[in-house]
């Protein structure tokens, strides 16, 4: 606990690139983090 290094938070967030996304999320083709 305390570290979410490999976790992708379950929030809907728009993005253009992976670095726009929190945690271990990547920017998916639909324009949202996942």
UniProtKB/Swiss-Prot annotation:
Listed A to Z, the keywords are:
Disulfide bond, Knottin, Plant defense, Protease inhibitor, Secreted, Serine protease inhibitor
Classification via CDD domains: PlantTI
Gene Ontology biological-process annotations: defense response; negative regulation of serine-type endopeptidase activity
GO cellular component annotations of the record: extracellular region
What is the residue range of the signal peptide feature? none
Cross-link type Cyclopeptide (Ser-Gly), residue numbers = 1-34
Q: Mainly resides where?
A: secreted
Compartments it resides in: Secreted
One example GO MF annotation: serine-type endopeptidase inhibitor activity
Name the PROSITE patterns for this protein: SQUASH_INHIBITOR
Q: Does the keyword Membrane apply?
A: no
For site (Reactive bond), what residue positions does UniProt give?
10-11
Q: How is it modified after translation?
A: This is a cyclic peptide.
Q: Which cysteines are joined by disulfide bonds?
A: 8-25, 15-27, 21-33
Fill in the domain comment: The presence of a 'disulfide through disulfide knot' structurally defines this protein as a knottin.
The text of the family note is: Belongs to the protease inhibitor I7 (squash-type serine protease inhibitor) family.
Which function does this protein serve?
Inhibits trypsin; probably participates in a plant defense mechanism.
This protein's name = Trypsin inhibitor 1
The organism encoding this protein is Momordica cochinchinensis (Spiny bitter cucumber)
Q: Specify the taxonomic lineage.
A: Eukaryota, Viridiplantae, Streptophyta, Embryophyta, Tracheophyta
